Amino acid sequence: MSIGYLKSILENGRNIVCLLGRGPAAEQGCDLYREDFSYDVEVRYGRSPSEIVNSTFYNNRPEVFYEFYREDILNRRGEPDEVNFCLKRLEDDGKLRGIVTRGFFDLSRRAGCHNVIHLYGNIDRNFCPHCGRIYDAEYILSHKPLPLCEKCGTLIHPGIALSGEMLDRRTMNRAIELISSADILLVVGTDLQSRLGSMAKYFTGDRICLINTTDHYSDEAADCV
């Protein structure tokens, strides 16, 4: 795919939706699945990242969970990169209607994008399960060892979805509705067989444009790669 061809497609789009994978965030160091990171976590905590980011572990060992959440997620949140700012420019031009992502580092919103649907939550919307009050990442970082709600004293729930918890059905429905209304689907940093990329099945528009650093057999389903 030539840059010029992609540019012409995006310029003609009026209702672009982006499926934003973890590729760009991983390049910023925001990746819980790197082998070296997983090894380091297991050495320090005696558990893998996937075992810690689990509802049972959170409920049984909240102090350890929040140590990991602060040191290994919030302190590794990175900064928006050129991908995020390109999406912001598309939004400013009135072409990009929204972003759907499984990432929870909130990079696109921090770049200035407004309609970002986080399927697995995000680190700046930690919440009190009792009264619903919202707390950002800075609050969690500054309240050790356990962040409690200022209003009712309840332990704050992390803003990210934990393994063993149900995803929010309303959020999923919003994402499906957004994708199904798009005329161009821009898939970035993932392939069409991933959990996020497979949501392209709800797309009924004109073009699927795929931007990824690695090839995948599912690429042939895209109109431009």
Predicted features, each with a name:
Residues M1-V225:
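Conserved catalytic core of sirtuin-type NAD+-dependent deacylases
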